[in-house]
């Protein structure tokens, strides 16, 4: 720090909204650096003479939420809310081939997660960050056990301009859930409308991404899992988790605090 180790004398910022145009400008030498290049273009950029790709994982986890509070899905056909049953939620989980999404949609530039946080965050527990296996047969059996042997209908709400390949991920999920009889209609729209309607409790089944700028698990629990929290749109509520959140806010002993966080992760 303090020692000049570059040859930059001036920086000009040139907003280029269209991703393809940004990449073309880079490859033609019109500009020197681009940010947020499309994942499908990274190999082409990397193989182009004089260009180098630098990447690092985002501090954000993308997940699909299911409203467990309403008695009847707004977009369903069963007259009730299948998401109230753990077996149904687990069935959808195990019907999603996360490795296929990583390989085909994200071109290898994603990391499957078992919890909504990541290494480096205070309270992260590696043992809990393990996913159940992708298993279509097990998912079908779980649906049958829950009383939905023929599946059901539901709408999946996604943004199409907020996260990397957000709509493409949702499109892949639609096909995967169809294999277990869950007929998903995709409703993708601009982020401004998506988040406003989600805040207004209009989503039965939705995509959301959550970062942890504080690098502390409390940020996740306070906004996503605390009873009545502003972004707790799955309407999860558990007195033990709420009590653990109070411990996170007041406990100064790190070992005790991390134990409370780990216990909360086990519950959710």
Q: Model regions: which residues?
A:
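Aromatic-rich, solvent-exposed beta-strand/loop patch
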Residues: 1-21, 42-62, 137, 160
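Short helix-initiation/N-cap motifs at beta->coil->alpha
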Residues: 13-24, 36-40, 161, 186-196
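Structural transition elements
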Residues: 94, 111-145, 162-167
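Short helices/loops that flank or line small-molecule/ion binding pockets
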Residues: 20-30, 44-48, 168-180, 192-203
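Extracytoplasmic/peripheral linker and loop segments enriched in polar/acidic and small residues
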Residues: 86-94, 102, 179, 183-194, ...
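A local structural motif
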Residues: 3-14, 30, 149-156, 174-189, ...
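Alpha-helical secondary-structure segments
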Residues: 7-10, 28, 59-113, 140-142, ...
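Ligand-binding "clamshell"
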Residues: 43-57, 200-203, 216-231
């Amino acid at each position: 720090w303090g020692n000049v180790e570059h040859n930059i004398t001036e920086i000009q910022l040139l907003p280029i909204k269209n991703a393809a145009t940004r990449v073309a400008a880079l490859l033609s030498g019109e500009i020197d650096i681009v940010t947020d290049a499309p994942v499908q273009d990274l190999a082409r950029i990397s193989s182009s003479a004089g260009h180098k790709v630098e990447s690092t994982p985002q501090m954000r986890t993308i997940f699909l939420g299911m409203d467990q509070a309403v008695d009847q899905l707004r977009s369903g056909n069963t007259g009730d809310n299948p998401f109230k049953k753990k077996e149904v939620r687990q069935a959808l989980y195990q019907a999603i081939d996360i490795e296929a999404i990583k390989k085909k949609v994200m071109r290898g530039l994603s990391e499957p997660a078992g919890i909504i946080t990541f290494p480096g965050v205070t309270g992260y527990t590696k043992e809990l960050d393990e996913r159940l296996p992708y298993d279509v047969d097990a998912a079908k059996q779980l649906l049958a056990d829950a009383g939905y042997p023929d599946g059901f209908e539901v709408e999946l709400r996604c943004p199409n301009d907020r996260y990397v390949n957000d709509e493409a991920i949702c499109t892949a999920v639609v096909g995967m859930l169809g294999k277990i009889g869950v007929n998903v209609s995709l409703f993708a729209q601009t982020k401004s409308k998506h988040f406003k309607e989600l805040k207004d409790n209009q989503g039965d089944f939705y995509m959301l991404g959550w970062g942890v700028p504080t690098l502390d698990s409390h940020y996740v629990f306070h906004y996503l899992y605390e009873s009545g929290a502003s972004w707790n749109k799955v309407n999860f509520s558990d007195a033990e988790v709420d009590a653990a959140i109070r411990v996170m806010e007041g406990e100064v002993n790190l070992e005790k605090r991390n134990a409370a966080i780990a216990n909360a992760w086990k519950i959710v």
